């Protein structure tokens, strides 16, 4: 069996986790996440809700990983991006007046 190395990454506002994991060729994104033990380190991760990706590209838990991949677990947005842009623009307008 061919061994491969991947990284599992998860970022909180105050701490980032990047965990290297040795897997077997043909293993999935979900297997990489489980092997990293990130689910026990960060108990706020719910794989039924959190989206995942490989190098910033959306992925499914069933997708195969390749040697050198970085599996990323994404947190849900806490603010609407459109609303935040509107507030920044309004604040900038007030500064120029």
Curated annotation (Swiss-Prot):
Gene3D superfamilies: RnfH-like (3.10.20.280). Belongs to the UPF0125 (RnfH) family. HAMAP family: UPF0125_RnfH. This is Protein RnfH. It comes from Proteus mirabilis (strain HI4320).
